[in-house]
Amino acid sequence: MTHYRRFYELIIVLLLAILTTLVFWLTDWDYRLASIFYHPEKIGDVWPLQHHWFLKILFDYAFPFIVAVGVSALSIFLLSHVHDHSRPYRRQALYVLLVIALGPGLVVNLIFKDHWGRPRPVHIQEFGGEYQYIPPVKIGHTLDKSFVCGHCSVGYAFFAVYFLAKNHKLIYLALTLGLAWTMGFTRMTAGGHFVSDILWSGYLVFLVAYALYYGWYARIKPSSLE
């Protein structure tokens, strides 16, 4: 069963990445979805929803939250070397820590976001900015950091729980997507990201969590970390 699930998980994510990217290359849906939150008639505040108090809380505390989760995982991993009651959770804690560090930390923010140069919606010409729209995956030549969504990766980091869970996987998957897409919504209201940025953030973090789980976690024996 695990072998088949491993195969289908990878195929489904790769197909979704290809199909959604093609849709955004061949249509103007990326632009149209972003335009829902753009109100040019409101002079001086063309992205008004971004000021909602709840959305501001989500924006301000997303990264402190995931840092706290990472620090907690690191603490459990370190404590497992001195306290027996933490030892059964050593591998799980290290796996969660690695997913956070390599997914949102390295791949999303340091590799893609910092170097892809895709303009944010707020900075493209259609929304009063200076840059031309660039479709997802295509590298831009601006200082903008639209591709991919960093705040969304905070939610997607909980793909780690999906992989670790032995039961109710679909529930954990739904909760992870719900959290990530809520974060994506907060960024779209400010003109910070396109839908394609949000989806690609998920594809990347999922692939990191997938590779760590099947390439390392599922292969090692608990005794190897003693």
Label every model-predicted segment.
Residues 11-18, 66, 70, 98-107, ...:
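Hydrophobic, lipid-facing residues on alpha-helical transmembrane segments of integral membrane proteins
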Residues 2-73, 113-120, 125:
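N-terminal transmembrane-helix/juxtamembrane module of multi-pass inner/ER membrane proteins
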Residues 25-27, 73-85, 163-168, 211-217:
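Structural signal for the C-terminal ends of transmembrane alpha-helices
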Residues 19-24, 101-107, 178-188:
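Aromatic-anchored segments of alpha-helical transmembrane domains
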Residues 4, 47-57, 84-88, 164-171:
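Juxtamembrane loop-transmembrane helix junctions in multi-pass integral membrane proteins
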